[in-house]
Amino acid sequence: RFKKIRRLGALPGLTSKRPRSGIDLKNQLRSGKRSQYRIRLEEKQKLRFHYGLTERQLLKYVHIAGKAKGSTGQVLLQLLEMRLDNILFRLGMASTIPGARQLVNHRHILVNGRIVDIPSYRCKPRDIITTKDKERSKVLIQNYIASSPHEELPNHLTIDPLQYKGLVNQIIDSKWIGLKIN
């Protein structure tokens, strides 16, 4: 993980740690002219590592975004931001996207009253995301909410921290996307 964030810069979904500031010797050695190929590859890798996708999953999302109306890049980012694991991360119910994936895989999360154990589940507007009624699930989420830095919540989400409930209001607006992609 740390090699990835050193190479690609801060990836808030992958880890809460930041690359050290200052000039590395390695960065000086590779500071030559960046080719278009290298820029595109680094941006693709940022997407993959931030959202925790495999190459095949990313290709599938690019294919879906290409068929949709609008800018392919914007539609792609909207699709990725509306994944269940990412929404849990944005709500503050998990400290990282891999942590959110684990919550979903271990069946702690309900969407509209039904257990969902697929992290790539695509949330829709008016979806209600809650925790299981088990004490263990609530304690996990409570610890994440208490320990997470209270960042500004995107417009498309609302959270009720007392009931451990989140609501998807609408599809995300492009200015609220957390990752800066070139």
UniProtKB/Swiss-Prot annotation:
* UniProt keyword annotation of Hydrolase present: no
Record PROSITE patterns = RIBOSOMAL_S4, S4
Query: Which InterPro entries does this one have?
Result: Ribosomal_uS4, Ribosomal_uS4_bac-type, Ribosomal_uS4_CS, Ribosomal_uS4_N, S4_RNA-bd, S4_RNA-bd_sf
Task: Provide the alphabetized UniProt keywords.
Answer: Chloroplast, Plastid, Ribonucleoprotein, Ribosomal protein, RNA-binding, rRNA-binding
Q: Which GO terms describe its cellular component?
A: chloroplast; small ribosomal subunit
Q: What is its main location?
A: plastid
**UniProt record, GO biological process:** ribosomal small subunit biogenesis; translation
- Subcellular location field: Plastid, Chloroplast
- S4 RNA-binding domain sequence ranges: 82-143
Q: How does it assemble?
A: Part of the 30S ribosomal subunit. Contacts protein S5. The interaction surface between S4 and S5 is involved in control of translational fidelity.
Q: Which family does it belong to?
A: Belongs to the universal ribosomal protein uS4 family.
Name the UniProt record assigns to this protein: Small ribosomal subunit protein uS4c
Taxonomic source organism: Tigridia sp. (strain Lejeune 1997)
